[in-house]
Amino acid sequence: MFYYLIAPLKNKTPPLTYFSKEQHPKGALVNIDLRNKTLLGVILEEVSKPSFECLELEKTPYFLLPFQIELAAFIAQYYCASLSLALSLFTPFKKCDIAKLEKIEPDLSALSQTQTNALNALQQHSISLLFGDTGSGKTEIYMHLIAQMLEQKKSALLLVPEIALTPQMQQRLKKVFKENLGLWHSKLSQNQKKQFLEKLYSQEIRLVVGTRSALFLPLKELGLVIVDEEHDFSYKSQQSPMYNARDLCLYLAHKFPIQVVLGSATPSLSSYKRFKDKALVRLKGRYTPTQKNIIFEKTPNFITPKLLEALKQAIDKNEQAIIFVPTRANFKTLLCQNCYKSVQCPFCSVNMSLHLKTNKLMCHYCHYSSPIPKICSACQSEVLVGKRIGTMQVLKELESLLKGAKIAILDKDHTNTQKKLHGILNDFNAQKTNILIGTQMISKGHDYAKVSLAVVLGIDNIIKSNSYRALEEGVSLLHQIAGRSARQISGQVFIQSTETDLLKNFLEDYEDFLQYELQERCELYPPFSRLCLLEFKHKNEEKAQQLSLKAAQILSLCLEKGVTLSSFKAPIEKIASSYRYLILLRSKNPLSLIKSVHAFLKTAPNIPCSVNMDPVDIF
């Protein structure tokens, strides 16, 4: 008999011992009985025969690869989650016949001398940051790196934010890597996922392009991971375990012979600080040089005569425009002009957004909706006005001002399926659309030859927010959106902001901003300090507060040297009827943070809380 310690998947139960008449390797997936249910579990290790009676396991053809087991253990430790939960993230491997590995002869574009120098520099490091201006040709460098890896009969992974998986990018990669390319994202059907995995098991797919969950796929002989748009917040999971896929890639490179390249036109301040003196590869200028004129308009209004004229000129020249708006719907909030009270969600401490198309107010946190009121509930005034314009309102106003113009929207409300997303982008690429209005989705990796005008509205709402990353997020967005225009023809960038004097300093070179921000960023925040956020919530506000107070008392006894603690009500006090209290831990040493949290979780296992290591924001 053989005895094994097994972690049940998708279950909070700690590892348990089972027996088998056969020997099994570490990482094998097996069926186990637990509380009258059959669950999948992962073999962690072989153990001695215990003193108690055990149930028998049942083998399956699936198993986790060594790098997956190593990564799961790190996730559990660093992000303070159960090992079972961490292992549940991974897709297992299945033995099958290996497809004949054909010699790959990709049809690659020749690199410029600048790109060749960057490629050679990247090859000198196992971990590096490719800091390349928008339009400088980062994707061509990625493709050369990937081709070299596939020629060595290894596999490669290109991680991208969800929206960056555009039809354009897919066609570009498909043309070069043909049947060796596989795409992985959240909108694949179960049948599509099954077909993808069969090709991955047989190693017919050797290049995976996907969103953050693609990191958990069973990629055999993984030799290269590229994290494009490494600054993007979507690499950070907001559900436990709250991992950051970018940071997990860096860990993989330290433990396995895997090359990792982070890429961005606007790298995060943390990555810039980490790499600036060692493995930062700078790629300046555009691959196709064009002229770009930047216009600032210091106004609180939106569709101004000056902006309208710029849009008309672009359309008259048979060119295209993109318009960034930070808010979807018609307006961010509905405000009474008499008592200045806004309409709040009854279940969340946030204002409800105005959606005129459905004639409803909607909460973008819990999705509660209600009819648009005709009078103010506080003072009975009938003068209710929408504030903070959204994508739908910009569309509505432009349709009345630009008769005959073809205008589309790219936001979460309009791209709930892959088909809709591709339809919007394909129409814009085919120039069936004159103007594309969008939220942050519009800033991600789109490359359209006829875009001569990029418009930025409402950027002040981002740079004046309470986040410690507010200015970084705002300036990064400006560069990303500005980079969508004048890629192959000359054009202009139109920015509405009251902070023109500040922003003008940073629009030539993003590195100027990064150096400025390194001087200005408070040392209590990343990249100078590490943070860990603990959230306590309850339907009863008093009980939520008591949970956090009790936790703070216990935590204060568990803190390692150099760790500080602050406890407070969450900036958004209530979400989905649950009141929220936060504890923020700070330290220069991440190991001290991790030890402190693990000690607390061990001491107070009955206090429910969620742990967010390295949060991207505090809300």
Identify the residue ranges that each predicted region occupies.
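Accessory, non-ATPase domains that flank or precede helicase/AAA+ motor cores in DNA-metabolism machines
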Residues: 1-264, 270-272, 276-288, 448, ...
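A general secondary-structure junction signal
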Residues: 45-47, 91, 325-327, 411, ...
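Inter-lobe coupling/hinge segments of SF2-like helicase ATPases
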Residues: 127-150, 154-206, 210-543, 582-583, ...
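Short amphipathic beta-strand starts and helix->beta connectors
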Residues: 514-522, 559-571
